[in-house]
From Swiss-Prot:
Source species of the chain: Enterobacteria phage S13
Protein name: A' protein
Keywords, alphabetical: DNA replication, DNA-binding, Endonuclease, Hydrolase, Metal-binding, Nuclease, Viral DNA replication, Zinc, Zinc-finger
One function term, GO molecular function aspect: zinc ion binding
Zn finger intervals (unnamed): 255-277
Entry's Gene Ontology BP terms: DNA replication; viral DNA genome replication
Gene: A
Biological role stated in the UniProt entry: The A protein is a specific endonuclease that cleaves the viral strand of supertwisted, closed circular DNA at a unique site in the A gene. The A protein also causes relaxation of supertwisted DNA and forms a complex with viral DNA that has a discontinuity in gene A of the viral strand. The A* protein binds to double-stranded DNA and prevents their hydrolysis by nucleases.
Residues annotated as catalytic: Y352, Y356
Statement: the UniProt record of this protein carries the keyword Glycosyltransferase: no
Pfam family, one: Phage_GPA
Length: 522
């Protein structure tokens, strides 16, 4: 006899309700709503208890969805299986029963976790489990959930049960939304780069611009090594650590950061990389290349040459007024005509690299794959044998995210900082992320139940756009998207928020003054 699959649906009754309305303090919930909406459930889910709750909720919903899909049109009668009235072969029935039993066992395992996730506990509390849980599993719920997420991601579940995601419909709405998302992503990347430039200048770090090319005879080695770029930047970080007389296995996050953007040449479509190195201390052996020379026309750092094993690199010191090189006594270089190098602001190199971020989106790079067809015709055969790779913008962890402390700001001020527009500060997206992180820490003592009760109703933006297009028309769709996310200006925010922007030195007016600082030197 096949198992009673219908009985599965009774298990759902053990799932803890998300709406214990009888116990809610509705005034408290209403007071929480603005902060939770501004912070966002995805950010709050980084807290252990809420994160595991959401993880199990999503896992259960997917497994139930797959089970419901598999059971469509399936009936059992005296041991025989019928699919939409047609009797299935015995081997088909046996396989169906075996797979479905495994699916139900996986669901039962997830349901067993749920009672251990006390939604009346705070969202920052790491769940452990009761005595019975320990006897059965010999590990905490935290350890179990982390292992489950690592070893059994939702993608693997879809693949095993042959239940792929439905492909979205490509229409004008989806294209506009995709373009808007990519534009926002590129804008955020550029903000991080420019903020890192600003911070490096303020902290007196050395900034080096580098171009990394790929030699013909090193292409295969580069494509065969998935960690080629990671290893290169790690080696540079270790050189900085060595210069500071620290251990090679120390973290170099506090003394070295990098930003790297790939580009395919417009002439031949050849892949190369533009990198910016930020170093608190120059690697050992770094000396002024113009020292003792009558013509000061050299800018490359000898200490960083020959560190890129896959081709040619050209590490150049970024020079501007009061830069770290000038403070270390380096001479100001001249151009090919012997004239002092043209004065530019310390942000100029940021704008230079930013143009490549704007030039190439992730989708552009994905479409290119190995590079344009014109990339050195003599290498076509070799390239065709290499695996296609997607090269994305790479940067250090938390690169360009540093901001003036927000610990003393009110919750109202933090909410406003998540809604600032670009006109208020060119670093509005970085401020938003920092404010959300601070809010998550403060909301850590709120219970899971309260967060679930206060979370806003989510709207499927794409469906909403498709429904609205009949009223507004395709021509007005772009402006309609912009109007849906209204941003605050300086005139809309409190004095506390304005004071924070002034103290951090990131108002548009303040940065406009700083951008006029020009290069100089000896």
């Amino acid at each position: 006899m096949p198992p009673n699959f219908g009985g599965f649906f009774m298990v759902r009754s053990y799932y803890p309700s998300e709406c214990h309305a009888d116990y809610f303090d509705f005034e408290r919930i209403e007071a929480l709503k603005p902060a939770i909406e501004a912070c966002g459930i995805s950010t709050l889910s980084q807290s252990p208890m809420l994160g595991f709750h959401k993880q199990m909720d999503n896992r259960i919903k997917l497994l139930e969805e797959i089970l419901s899909f598999r059971m469509q049109g399936v009936e059992f009668d005296n041991g025989d299986m019928y699919v939409y009235g047609h009797k299935a072969a015995s081997d088909v029935r046996d396989e169906f029963v075996s797979v479905t039993e495994k699916l139900m066992d996986e669901l039962a395992q997830c349901y067993n976790v749920l009672p251990q996730l006390d939604i009346n506990n705070t969202i920052d509390h790491p769940p452990e489990g009761d005595e019975k849980w320990f006897l059965e599993n010999e590990k905490t719920v935290t350890q179990f959930c982390r292992k489950l997420a690592a070893e059994r991601p939702l993608k693997d579940i879809r693949d095993e049960y042959n239940y792929p995601k439905k492909k979205g419909i490509k229409d004008e709405c989806s294209r506009l939304l995709e373009a808007s998302t990519m534009k926002s992503r590129r804008g955020f990347t550029i903000q991080r780069l420019m903020n890192a430039m600003r911070q490096a200048h303020a902290d007196g770090w050395f900034i080096v611009f580098d171009t990394l090319t790929l030699a013909d005879d090193r292409l295969e080695a580069f494509y065969d090594n998935p960690n080629a770029l990671r290893d290169y930047f790690r080696d540079i970080g270790r050189m900085v650590l060595a210069a500071e007389r620290r251990k090679a296995n120390d973290s170099h996050a506090d003394c070295y950061q990098y930003f790297c953007v790939p580009e395919y040449g417009t002439a031949n479509g050849r892949l190369h990389f533009h990198a910016v190195h930020f170093m608190r201390t120059l690697p050992s052996g770094s000396v002024d290349p113009n020292f003792g020379r009558r013509v000061r026309n050299r800018r490359q750092l000898n200490s960083l040459q020959n560190t890129w094993p896959y081709g040619y690199s050209m590490p150049i010191a970024v020079r501007y007024t009061q830069d770290a090189f000038s403070r270390s006594g380096w001479l100001w270089p001249v151009d090919a005509k012997g004239e002092p190098l043209k004065a530019t602001s310390y942000m100029a190199v940021g704008f230079y690299v930013a143009k490549y971020v704007n030039k190439k989106s992730d989708m552009d790079l994905a479409a290119k794959g190995l590079g344009a067809k014109e990339w050195n015709n003599s290498l076509k055969t070799k390239l065709s044998l290499l695996p296609k790779k997607l090269f994305r913008i790479r940067m250090s962890r938390n690169f360009g995210m540093k901001m003036f402390t927000m610990t003393n700001l009110s919750m109202e001020c933090l909410i406003q900082l998540t809604k600032l527009g670009y006109d208020a500060t060119p670093f509005n997206q970085i401020l938003k992320q920092n404010a959300k992180r601070e809010m998550r820490l403060r909301l850590g003592k709120v219970t899971v139940a309260d967060v679930l009760a206060a979370q806003p109703v989510t709207t499927n933006l794409l469906k909403f756009m498709r429904a609205s297009i009949k009223m507004i028309g395709v021509s007005n769709l772009q402006s309609f998207i912009a109007s849906m996310t209204q941003k605050l200006t300086l005139s809309d925010i409190s004095d506390e928020s304005k004071n924070y922007l002034d103290k951090a030195g990131i108002t548009t007016a303040c940065l406009r003054i700083k951008s006029k600082w020009t290069a100089g030197g000896k």
